[in-house]
Structure formats: C-alpha cells, structure tokens
Amino acid sequence: MKKAFTGILASLLLVTTLAGCGTEQAAPQNTASGDTGTKNEAKKGGKLTLYSPNAAEVNNPIIKEFQDRTGIEVQLISGGTGDLLKRVQAEAVSPQGDVFWAGGADSLEAYKKFFEPYKTKENDNLLPEYVDKNGVWTPFAALPMVIMYNKELVKAGEEPKSWNDLLDPKWKGKIAYADPAKSGSSYTQLVTMLTAFGKDDKGWDFVKNFVKNLDGKVLSGSGLVYKGVADKEFAIGITLEEAALRYVEGGAKVGIVYPSEGTSAVPDGAAIIKGAPNMEQAKQFIDFLVGKDVQSLIQKEFKRRSVRKDAEPIQGIVQTKDIKLVNYDFDFAASKKDDNIKHFSKIITGAE
C-alpha cells in the first residue's frame, strides 16, 4: 500500500494547483487501473471541499490518494492562511467548506469558534505535545522555523546565526519575510521572534529594528520567501524548515540555520469547519491525514516531521531533540493574534 502511495508522486508533481486567494479547482482524478491500496477499504463516496494554503506538491499526492481510497470527490480551494480564515469567518452563517487543512495551529486556534471539535480515531497514536486538548484542530506536521540563505549571495562564514544577526545593516533590503496578516507561518515566526526577546517592549523593539532592515519589502505569501532566496532575489529569508529542506534536497545552493536564541516547532493543523456540509467525509479526511501512510509520506517525500508516536526519525536532518526551542506561548499567539497583527501593521506603515 505504501509503495503504491509513494510511487504516484512523480506524475502527481506535474499537476499544478492554481494558487492564489480563493482559487478553486477539482482535485486530480485517478483513472489508472490496478491496486491503489483500497481492496479492504469500503468506498463511501460523496464530496469534500478543502480550504488549504499548502503548496501544490504537498496537496496533490495526498488528496489524490484520499480520493482513490474513499471514492470521495475533493474540491480544493487554495490561498493564503489569513485570507482563507477570513473566508471561513465570512461564510459562517452558510458554510461552503468542510475542512481547513494546514496553516499554523495557533492561527486555527485564533479562529476556533468557526471550527467543529473532532477527536480523530488516530488520537492515541499522536504525540501528546502536539495535540489540542480541546480537539478543535488536529496536528498534521511539526514545523520548525529557520533562516534560509543563498550560498551564492552569502559568503561562507557570514551566514546569520541568530535572530539578532538579522539586524545587521548588511542585510538591509535583502531579507525575505511574508506578511503575518496573510501567512500563518509568518505569524508564527513573528511570535517566535517576540518570544526570543520578550513579549513586551523588548520584543517589539526587536521587531521594529527587524522591520527597518526589511526596507519596506514585505511579501504577500510564504511561498515567495523560499522561492525568492533560491532564485537569488533575496540573500536570506525566514521560512519553514521543510520548505528550505526541499530546496536543499533538490540541489539548490541554499543553506539553513536554526537561530541560536531558539526557534519554534508549532504544528500546522487541520480542522473541520463548523456546520460543514459534508461532515462525515470531513472526519474521514482528518483521520486520513494523521494515519501512518500519510505521515510516512510527508517524512520521506517532504521532510516534514511527523506528529505520530510510531514515526521513524528522518535521516539526514537535525533531530528534533537537538533543536533549541523558545518557550513558545501558544495561548498568547492565539488569543492575541489580532492585537499582534495590528501592532505589526502599525510598525510597517510607520504609525509606530
């Protein structure tokens, strides 16, 4: 079953998801015959609408396999985390989506009143440090935040080693960073930096100096960060570990740094939209995401850290226990998200 799952990746990665806020598409269908690992699994059918900020290369193989195994037709709507969460909020009276998949769990928590609590059948197999005690969201993968740099633009030995190094004047205008109002991962990065220097005036003083070094360049989406660094548009960028590792694995001349002050490894998650039109199919999809097959796939193919207890360590990368982490305040990140975004926006616009 696993062999069949991973074997379809090469062809699937040729399928491009139409990216952008509110872009809608029918997920790819499989018309090939043969064993897709569904012989012992009943096909219940039905439909499912997903809202997802994930990259196409992550979405496509997982959605396709879910369709093959269940017979459920998936409609994918892609966009940035912030825009899609606002869409869920706007549709609250008459929900159009079923599952919100990915985006930092702290961002999902901030919108928890729009999600339906669900305890996955795989709950006992998940690492407890990543599980939401209230069951509003289900963890998908643990995502350390890193500094990514281009080896052709950054001389050996001059790589930033810390968050504080990002304030060096030599990096002014050369840092790729996404707008935390639009990107869930960027918001997590903002809170990580605040935590490293103090969630009070000291932390915000650091953020003000960091923004000065951005020199007015704030990107509209997280995907533009790692792409911008790899394409030599920026010397360095703040991004997800798994995104940077995909470029490293692909042979790009980039490197990654785990900041010396500590970073975060907040999971991204999936949540069922309250009042979802296809509730049973939504539950099936949540269970599927944290099942052993999908969790093995994301480790092997995407270098994402599994949230399962029985997951094997990913070879060739720093082990989780060896990454210095800040004491990330999840409740602060979720409950103060609107305030933190407004504060950051004032700094960006020069109002503060």
Model-derived features with residue positions:
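Short, low-complexity disordered leader/linker segments with a strong preference
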Residues: 1-47, 309-310, 350-352
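Short, polar/charged alpha-helical segment
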Residues: 34, 39, 43-44, 49-75, ...
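Extracytoplasmic ligand-binding site segments that recognize negatively charged/polar headgroups
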Residues: 49-59, 82, 89, 95-233
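A ligand-binding cleft/hinge motif common to bilobed small-molecule-binding domains
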Residues: 106-111, 230, 235-253, 302
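A bilobed periplasmic-binding-protein/Venus flytrap-type ligand-binding module shared by bacterial periplasmic
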Residues: 146-153, 191-194, 266-278, 297-298
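Periplasmic-binding protein-like
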Residues: 207-211, 218-219, 250-274, 309-310
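Mature extracytoplasmic/periplasmic domains
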Residues: 264, 273-328
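Extracellular/periplasmic bilobal clamshell ligand-binding domains
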Residues: 316-352
